[in-house]
Amino acid sequence: MMHRLYHYPLSPFSRKVRLVLAEKKIEVELIEERYWEPSPEFLRLNPAGRVPILRINNYTFCESNSICEYLEEKYPDYPLMPNNVEERAEVRRIVNWFDDSFYKEVTLNLLGERIMKKIKGTGYPDSKNVKEGAKRIKFHLDYIADLLDNRRWLAGNTMSMADFSAAAQVSCIDYISDVDWNRSSAVKDWYAKIKCRPAFRSLLADQISGFPQPQHYSDLDF
């Protein structure tokens, strides 16, 4: 069975799917797609023009959460959703928090302004947006710390899709050195646990032309 993932290395939604595929030990061919310059083939696969897109034989799956839910149901080994229905609801809530709130308030304002505008050729960083992102990430790091106050992982005592959704966003911001790892030892320890997982290796190897990763980015010991 051929798995093919159309992705962009600094797309947090692509990263989330890559983490799930790797954690479930599913081999996949990665195809880097400059989604802002979509090819006709790419638009045929997803008229919305967004990554990630997962192709499995003749089936096409779009949107990261739909893909992740499919993979969880299709490949139940190495589960990333708890059995308890209330716990599953909490996982989904946290996934949505990072996919929506963190992405809009932090990722777009920091990664979007500082790197993606240059890559896309759409102008210069807006300092107002960058300042807002730098302000909001403090709130989100504190929220992660609050979640970890009485939990081993973000949604409970086992690692779940919630952790991968959060780590996908945080890793993109870490690529541009905009995460204050001294703000919370609990957050740093949580990220270190995820960072050390074999599933994370391909993300740590990502290189963006013109934007070298910081030295600590791939350092498992920070």
Locate predicted features.
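GST-like domain detector, emphasizing the conserved glutathione-binding G-site
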Residues: 1-131, 145, 221
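Short, solvent-exposed turn/loop segments enriched in Gly/Ser/Thr/Pro and often Arg
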Residues: 8, 161, 207-208
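Positions that flank functional sites
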Residues: 35-36, 159, 209-210
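Short, solvent-exposed alpha-helical surface patches in well-structured domains
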Residues: 90-93, 189, 202
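GST-like fold's C-terminal all-alpha helical module
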Residues: 98-196
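A late-sequence structural motif
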Residues: 197-198, 202-203
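Acidic/histidine-enriched, glycine/proline-rich intrinsically disordered or flexible terminal extensions
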Residues: 207-222
